[in-house]
Amino acid sequence: VEMRDNPALRDIPLAIGGSRVQRGVISTANYPARKFGVRSAMPTATALKLCPHLTLLPGRFDAYKEASNHIREIFSRYTSRIEPLSLDEAYLDVSDSEHCHGSATLIAQEIRQTIERELRLTASAGVAPVKFLAKIASDMNKPNGQFVIAPHQVAEFVRALPLAKIPGVGKVSAAKLENMGLRTCGDVQNSDLAMLLKRFGKFGRILWERSHGIDEREIHNDRQRKSVGVERTLAEDIHEWPECEAIIENLYPELERRLAKVKPDLLIARQGIKLKFNDFQLTTQEHVWPRLNKEDLIATAHKAWDERRGGRGVRLVGLHVTLLDPQLERQLLLGI
């Protein structure tokens, strides 16, 4: 959106995020910036070391939201089965669509062309029979391209697929799997499911299924929000508990406001806190609590501060709540 509205930004390294003065975090970066190693969720200071000539913009959320809504409206012309993942990403199930003679490949191509024509924005797409492969395919021909994994190609594609490419397999998990001699989905196909279950539990079964091209998750139009949170990256590290308590006091009204938007009765399943230390290690602590409560959050944070800080400075403080499962909430209300 920024490059569309200002063509001078198109070919230079650009990122949306915190300023050079205050410590912030990169929200997103364009492809010229990514060539220097700049990534989302990266501290701004790190990004500037990698790319000193990086152009930083504070971001215009309203403009991004407007573009996102327009794109969702384009999606809806082809199917009602849409599962948004973020402002700029969504799953679409077009298996019952009559557009383009029912061809998912042609539908994806037409959607991309429509986005470019109506919004002057580029889009990438992945087409596959199951969700996780569509996600992987969407990253194959970025930017402004698409990649198709037809049903008859799944077995061959998956066999050679590195496990690190599977959504949910992070660097730590990939390293553990590598140490076990498991680098590709083909390696997992030749391994024992019982061993994976013993070593990784539920994740072991998911890994086994994905390695066989199995993903039975359906598109969920009405994805239920599971949590609400608010956090602050600090301009300078803090080392004294009263400073942390003051930040929580300032953050709490915003958490209360955000929660009230989705749960006016403020009923929750759990609430907790997050602290990020100056070595970038993160700790969270939460427990079951029926209703948003500031005093309990402060007590929880104080406990984490005393037991887990170890003299380190704190660079981020966050508060969050986990929402009640709607079905469980109905049961509780019926019980009352």
Regions found by a protein language model. Give the residues of each.
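Gly/Gly-Pro- and Ser/Thr-rich, intrinsically disordered tail segments characteristic of DNA damage-repair
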Residues: 1-199, 205, 321, 325-336
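DNA-contacting surface of Y-family translesion DNA polymerases
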Residues: 165, 173-316, 324-329
